[in-house]
Amino acid sequence: MRHKHGYRKLGRTSSHRKALLKNLAIALIEHNKIETGIYKAKELRSYIEKLTTVARVGDFNAHRHVFAYLQNKEATHKLVTEIAPKYAQRNGGYTRIQRTTFRIGDASTLATIEFV
């Protein structure tokens, strides 16, 4: 039984899931808005909001913490210096998820996730 399980497995191994969330987070930081499956978007929201909360501090340790998750210098720099300072007075809720359409091939629900 999977009652009260803390996260979605997304049909992937733990390493594949970790790489997927990292790549989606980098894409969201670079483009400010991406379209993906609804459940991937919901998992990404949790992942990116935790990173944004840490990045709001803006010091050297925040850079290190964010880089440890993203492993991408440009995305880390953009998150800590450009995106996170916008949310200095906001307590969570940095992203918005909107259902958009259904994918043609398998009719799965798609959604856009963007920074507010």
Swiss-Prot record:
The keyword Ribosomal protein applies. Disulfide bonds: none annotated. GO terms for biological process: translation. GO terms for molecular function: structural constituent of ribosome. The keyword Ribonucleoprotein applies. Keywords: Ribonucleoprotein, Ribosomal protein. One of its GO terms (cellular component) is cytosolic large ribosomal subunit. InterPro entries: Ribosomal_bL17 (IPR000456), Ribosomal_bL17_CS (IPR047859), Ribosomal_bL17_sf (IPR036373). Part of the 50S ribosomal subunit. Contacts protein L32. Belongs to the bacterial ribosomal protein bL17 family. HAMAP family: Ribosomal_bL17 (MF_01368). This is Large ribosomal subunit protein bL17. It comes from Helicobacter acinonychis (strain Sheeba).
